[in-house]
Amino acid sequence: MVPWLGPDDPFPSVERALGAASGAPGLLAASADLLPSRLIDAYRRGIFPWYSDGQPVLWWSPDPRMILVPAEFRISATFRKTLKRVLREPRWEIRVDCDFAGVMRACAQAPRRGQRGTWITAEIIDAYSSLHRAGDAHSIETWLDGRRVGGLYGVSFGRMFFGESMYAHASDASKIALAALVAHLREHRVEMIDCQQNTSHLASLGGREIARKTFVAHVRRAVAEPPIPWRFDKRVVAGLLGQAASATAADAFDR
């Protein structure tokens, strides 16, 4: 039985989330509210909301957990050429927090294979916009010829980034934003991006699954660190093109 959380009820232990044999593996709790304080508490515990319009707020903590270690980000030969062009041509820009709400709306409207509608509801946009105004949620945006053509958004506490969604209106535009995020996080010694659930696209870029207990233990440590700055210079992306992945960082989490 999934517990119902009242406004003052704490989250149960993530170990109580439904298991693989259930119809909803990883489902931990449900509630009527999506208050910013609840959202902040959730992320700090390795929990995230995911639900559709008309449903209660559903809170999840799956096991295993999909992550991307910045040092393990994979760049194909073709995408390497794309990044070099982005660095070389002024018509390409990478902006941070220029249009956070616009990125969220674009992610909500992006078609997803096998998915009808969107989980990025008006309530979700309002809640994450509140986190953004507080400096806890950020957008990385790809701009071409003065037009936003792709991007992603997520939540950041300490030295931990929790990815939420991405979209592209031009070829590789979301991947460019992800590469910029990876470069920025590497620059500031962030060791893990939470990707929540496994997808073949994330796996092709270096994402992998780790045990929930390993993930939660890392989150607990990382969110206690001082926050990283969110000023960005696209030249940091050059570091991705000339540096091999760090074996030390790559081996820091159980496979």
Curated annotation (Swiss-Prot):
Where found? Answer: Cytoplasm
Gene Ontology BP term (one): protein catabolic process
**Gene Ontology CC entries for this record:** cytoplasm
Keyword annotations for this protein, in alphabetical order, are:
Acyltransferase, Cytoplasm, Transferase
Q: Which InterPro entries match?
A: Acyl_CoA_acyltransferase (IPR016181), Leu/Phe-tRNA_Trfase (IPR004616), Leu/Phe-tRNA_Trfase_C (IPR042203), Leu/Phe-tRNA_Trfase_N (IPR042221)
List, in alphabetical order, the Gene Ontology terms for molecular function in this entry. leucyl-tRNA--protein transferase activity
Looking up SUPFAM superfamilies in the UniProt record yields: Acyl-CoA N-acyltransferases (Nat)
Q: Which Pfam families match?
A: Leu_Phe_trans
- The top EC class, named as a word, is transferase
Q: Does the keyword Kinase apply?
A: no
Q: What is its EC number?
A: 2.3.2.6
What family does the Swiss-Prot or TrEMBL record give for this protein? Belongs to the L/F-transferase family.
> Which purpose does this protein serve, as stated in its record?
Functions in the N-end rule pathway of protein degradation where it conjugates Leu, Phe and, less efficiently, Met from aminoacyl-tRNAs to the N-termini of proteins containing an N-terminal arginine or lysine.
Output the NCBIfam families linked to this UniProt entry: aat (TIGR00667)
What protein name does the entry list? Leucyl/phenylalanyl-tRNA--protein transferase
Q: Which organism is it from?
A: Burkholderia pseudomallei (strain K96243)
